[in-house]
């Protein structure tokens, strides 16, 4: 939305021959009539004033500021009314501005106003002349005027005070004054608007401004550039800083003024930064945090990286994770925590005090968790600091693998993830979790454009090479079932996977050309990067892995092979809780899940609990591991299963 005052559209001229004569008489009369002064209180809007649309409060306020600064530069045209009153036929906005100043006690009610008094029969002609010939200053004229005053040494604040504009508006117009002359000429000729100029002003180099302008004209329909195209050409390798969690974490001070592209015309005063530079700064800060934790907590090594260590993907061959020790609070901490919880529970509503109490309790638990790592554990392990879902992710107790322990880890992983029979899972839960799994795979695939493209090509080849080509061109059908998936998945529209999909959808929607749905040739202007992102996202949206059960047999998940290909792990997108998973299981299934995760002690404790308590118990103990139900994972290759059998035999 433009924030700059712009030229109003001129109405089509109408034939007003009788008015012409009146205007000639009026002009002659006004030239001969001397100005007189009348008290402001005696002036009212004339009933013969042809203007019916009220003046905007902003325009009246600006004029009032101008009158306050330089006085009333133009007289009012009035005619006599009964009772020593005068009707204002020409100058209604000036009258409104004067009344505003009087209401603010800036001028008295009897302040003398310069007027010219005309006969009542010419009042309508005067009003028509005033309103019919009114022409707001063109933006190009305003830019030139502001530039001339700035060259005289006046500051934006001084210019604004003098003319009744805000300093912010003056700054913005002076920013446009630095545009290349050819662009300002196009604005003066009404070939472009101030919105085009605002987008071009993102680029400081005038030569680059002209290049972008010409490129946008060539790609625009009929040679008319699109604002969106200009903005994309200027910032194609950059990301917006407004609302960007990475930029907020790194901080604006990390970048020099030359590295930040400030958008003076955005409502949130945002801007743009190079995406590569932002990621480099983020990685540098993550490494700094990791170094601080290593030194403060006594770990052997540390690492800062863009993504968390994944123990079931390619990282599995490099890293392994120590089981997190149970946090133990001291007696003083237990006492303090109970006190805080009592105060927290006594509060009826969320407030500043509750936030402070919650933060202190969270800090105490966090400190206890860190303290639980023994010096021996820290001596042979490291801490990894990464970026996940817009926040810093800290992984403690990470160990580097040696070649000798790879086989042991494979055995342990297979033992922990021994599959439960999918037939024992209720159909409603099967539908819920396979929907959740589908959304997660969609989000993971969306992030790997090369795999998405391969999947798309493979799917098309099944149709073309398997059953013959279609007679009509590009007869491709895609069904996006987010409505049913979010309805069935426990996380709904609040899940991490769906929110990531919607964020990418919003980003891509902003890149689509104007009128794209009506004309496929608009896509010819898109870069290969954008096209690849669109293909990747749309392919991901087509993924469908909801399982069914017929005649007592559960269908195999179609996601198994794809998950293996993209290195997918469900816990990257989903956290099992009582509400979304454990509460839907039978108590023996909860106990079995704890045993599968290697939490035999917790499983024994769950045996003594009621089902609801056991579900909460499982949620608590599963929150920091990577366990996923066996029937929600892709099956291991047969060779792995054979090796596991051999290992079991050797162990026996």
Swiss-Prot record:
A Pfam family: ParBc
GO MF, one annotated term: DNA binding
Coiled-coil ranges per UniProt: none
Xref: InterPro entries: Chromosome_partition/occlusion, ParB/RepB/Spo0J, ParB/Sulfiredoxin_dom, ParB/Sulfiredoxin_sf
Gene3D superfamilies: 1.10.10.2830, 3.90.1530.30
Highest rank taxon of the organism: Bacteria
Signal peptide range: none
Biased composition (Basic and acidic residues): 1-13, 641-652
Any GO CC annotation of this UniProt entry: chromosome
Alphabetically ordered keywords of this record: Plasmid
Listed GO biological process terms: chromosome segregation
Residue numbers spanned by region Disordered: 1-21, 628-652
Family stated for the protein in its record: Belongs to the ParB family.
Protein name in UniProt: Uncharacterized protein YubM
Protein encoded by which gene: yubM
